[in-house]
Amino acid sequence: MKLIPFLSEEEIQKLQEAEANSSKEQKKTAEQIEAIYTSGQNILVSASAGSGKTFVMAERILDQLARGVEISQLFISTFTVKAATELKERLEKKISKKIQETDDVDLKQHLGRQLADLPNAAIGTMDSFTQKFLGKHGYLLDIAPNFRILQNQSEQLLLENEVFHEVFEAHYQGKQKETFSHLLKNFAGRGKDERGLRQQVYKIYDFLQSTSNPQKWLSKSFLKGFEKADFTSEKEKLTEQIKQALWDLESFFRYHLDNDAKEFAKAAYLENVQLILDEIDSLNQESDSQAYQAVLARVVAISKEKNGRALTNASRKADLKPLADTYNEERKTQFAKLGQLSDQIAILDYQERYHGDTWKLAKTFQSFMSDFVEAYRQRKRQENAFEFADISHYTIEILENFPQVRESYQERFHEVMVDEYQDTNHIQERMLELLSNGHNRFMVGDIKQSIYRFRQADPQIFNEKFQRYAQNPQEGKLILLKENFRSSSEVLSATNDVFERLMDQEVGEINYDNKHQLVFANTKLTPNPDNKAEFLLYDKDDTGEEEESQTETKLTGEMRLVIKEILKLHQEKGVAFKEIALLTSSRNRNDQILLALSEYGIPVKTDGEQNNYLQSLEVQVMLDTLRVIHNPLQDYALVALMKSPMFGFDEDELARLSLQKAEDKAHENLYEKLVNAQKKASSQKGLIHTALAEKLKQFMDILASWRLYAKPHSLYDLIWKIYNDRFYYDYVGALPNGPARQANLYALALRADQFEKSNFKGLSRFIRMIDQVLEAQHDLASVAVAPPKDAVELMTIHKSKGLEFPYVFILNMDQDFNKQDSMSEVILSRQNGLGVKYIAKMETGAVEDHYPKTIKLSIPSLTYRQNEEELQLASYSEQMRLLYVAMTRAEKKLYLVGKGSREKLEAKQYPAAKNGKLNSNTRLQARNFQDWLWAISKVFTKDKLNFSYRFIGEDQLTREAIGELETKSPLRDSSQADNRQSDTIKEALEMLKEVEVYNTLHRAAIELPSVQTPSQIKKFYEPVMDMEGVEIAGQGQSVGKKISFDLPDFSTKEKVTGAEIGSATHELMQRIDLSQQLTLASLTETLKQVQTSQAVRDKINLDKILAFFDTVLGQEILANTDHLYREQPFSMLKRDQKSQEDFVVRGILDGYLLYENKIVLFDYKTDRYDEPSQLVDRYRGQLALYEEALSRAYSIKNIEKYLILLGKDEVQVVKV
């Protein structure tokens, strides 16, 4: 069809007016209409939380398709695979609806083609696009298309370590080994090895991977801070700060003398106050920096006289105490600032003195990093395995260096769209620039929700365009979506109240003004005073505890507060548990939260990413078992294995065995002592009684058999042999939380199998890999198990982004911000490059022998201090945005939960607000969310804030006050009469006589098989057959049935049956790792694991499998793996119509997606067919059985059923 012109500004305005005057219940806002229809220039849509940005994107795409644009001409980048799937589903519905509504034949045909092409559209993450791009164009850089992605963190770490040690050895033995040795020692710390340097190298490498060209950034920007260091300018800045601080101090003391000092006329401290004022008065306009520094030194010295009490107002008069306390508090604040400035003078002097040495160290570091980056890049090319960032770098390299490729994409894409633009990093931004023609970008995001700085996302990319487009519309169009269609007015008012007073350009990176404030738009939610946001504080004064370290007890109090509110919502207001979310900034306290909820019987569902897999007890036992099999001379691991439930040695037995040392040896490992005990070669052999000797023999025999088995067999087989030999898998299944424990053990075997499939072989390397993961303080993700259906959601704020819940509790408001980055030896900045702490060796000048002649001094470089200030502002801004995301998840009511001493919090004093914002020092000195909220509550008391605070003490949190969860026992009342045995043998004999009569009457029931499979009874549902049940099911077992025998086939060619292909295909679909990007190479590797012959493998069409995952259903499965269940066995009781007897149906479901209110069931079929309807009729009954089983199991009636037909050249997905 011909392209239909896009709307002009005048036409858009008319559309806005028509919409405003329409009688629609839910109208589009003027800004939404503008965002949907504006064209011909770059557009930035700043979409606040809940403003309908996904709706706008979908409508804009639909409008462009309706005007003749092809879906293949749109590049649409989403932040997650799930978001891409949801957008495709939304588009599928909208396009289908448009086709039904229009009478235009050309448009119908055009939209029909777009619907067919939708699965292949460029809608997805940047990672998925770059993978496909490199697969297609990688040959330009000599990259084979069958590359794989290094998604396994342990494998990546192993490769990284190997390359690091190679580069390390080359530098350690190279020409510059002396300067390199200095670099090594600079980061060695107490460890005195390479680990400190390695940690910093990996940190810098991760940062480099987020740049569009790592080597270029290393050469151009890494040393930028050293090159532009200006100590004269820094001294001038410091002098200005000293000048201002001294003036502030003078103003404070003069005010005190003029107003309050008369109350303390004879106080000794006033003489020292006058001395300080005299010192400050000695300064004038001609005073230089030296003079200011000298006065500062004398003022600080005076304050430290009399053990620091020279300026303290020590008045004890009750009526004057508040006045004295206020003076003393302010004086401390003033001198704390002066003390910091005094320290900065000394630090700046050291920085200048050691600047040359630090720069030399940085150059050595730059050389090492350059070699490491290149060596690691080459190693990954040899392995043909890359990180996602590598794929992006190669994509950029091709687009930059091959104009014909770049121009073909620029010509192809009518528009380059990106969602969640605030979380874009510099690689992605460069790629978007290269794909665009310069004026066809559509960017949607919200800088207030940029919370992925730890992944190198840079909100300033968004902010720079926001400011530029706002100032100059010729640069691009800025559209603001402020209306919130998600939350109640109470939630929005509270959020606005907080951020209007908290966030500005100085601290927060944006000014929270009318461009960013949330506007209530959900007319379905009427105002309700009960939904006013609450700031709940557990009062620590009531606990009687003084130890700050006793966090567990205090958190329990906070959690009891939360549990009380949850039970109130659930039992008094009828709120389902699944409508409640508990949000945390980190998972550090999740164990205590889960324990508290469990104690009160409240069901909970976590976000499934605990990342404490290696810390689970059952996995630790297995890892120690593998360590012992590899090397039994490891005492800790050996004791752990012996004490484990697999062998159950107690302390007494281990003590007896540990005393079995040979007389002629000074030291022996425990294993050697066990050998001595078996040989009775110790003087303490009398301690080994018969029972212990037999137990020891069994242990040693089993251990020897495992060690022997490990040599020729795979890790997977070894692990399962251990499980089976000692019934350990079954044992953990009987423990509390058994299914999760078994899932962990099952995952250990699978991870070992994946490890060996990744070109890494052997028990030794597997153990080394695990130890490296633990050493790096990393962990593997815990294994998910089926969550309860109605449960409170516990998740991190990061995980909650994009979600919404009626009731939201933000927990741990008192948890301190993570400032680990600011304590690092290295801080990086895109503007300044490397900031580093330099370890200087200084002479002390000490004469006495007991004093050290030299000391080591850690001196932060000038760039380090600059980067530290930049990092502090960026970190606080990110924490503000994190709080914003958390608060805007709530639909109805918001609870902010913290704890603290009421007395101390009420006594806190804060500087006055400035321009309606908290004082910048108040904001920058906050340690947690609670400090911000409390300061706002106190400073803006008169403003009638839309959230209230209240303290809850122990007296309100007793077990009786909290209450209990009302539960009904599922057990029926039992009657002992039902269990009485016959009193006499006579009664038993009479019962036996009745058996024959009973058997005759119920012959049909006796002949009914007690267990049947869906394939046996699917014939019940075939329209040409009898529906009676027993007779049909019994046909397969009929005595009168003719028996036929196949003649033997003597041909040498291996025959492959359809059943074999079907079984192998099912096993393949079960084994596919859906957490990784699916490629032909990864499927080929998975196919090798399938237990079948090579002839069968050759018959399986992997392209067809890949094609399935490009369908709408396939994409839905990939995007919802946390809801996915594969190869699930089931049993179901059914009643036979003829005999009226129950029988069991057993089968295995190929897979299903379990959502809250629906289930998507799918079944693979490899049968040959002419028309899909043939298989639909054939398997309709079987799917009906599956549907019944799922419906009974989950009490869900909405079940979608699909057949995935693999019997033809092209895969077909048919809804039944």
Curated annotation (Swiss-Prot):
Cellular component aspect of the GO annotation: cytosol; DNA helicase complex
Q: What is this protein called?
A: ATP-dependent helicase/nuclease subunit A
Necessary cofactors: Mg(2+)
Q: Which PROSITE patterns match?
A: UVRD_HELICASE_ATP_BIND, UVRD_HELICASE_CTER
**Top-level taxon of the source organism:** Bacteria
Give the species. Streptococcus pneumoniae (strain CGSP14)
Subunit description: Heterodimer of AddA and AddB/RexB.
Chain positions recorded as ATP binding sites: A47, S48, A49, G50, S51, G52, K53, T54
Please report which protein family the annotation says this sequence is part of.
Belongs to the helicase family. AddA subfamily.
Describe its function. Answer: The heterodimer acts as both an ATP-dependent DNA helicase and an ATP-dependent, dual-direction single-stranded exonuclease. Recognizes the chi site generating a DNA molecule suitable for the initiation of homologous recombination. The AddA nuclease domain is required for chi fragment generation; this subunit has the helicase and 3' -> 5' nuclease activities.
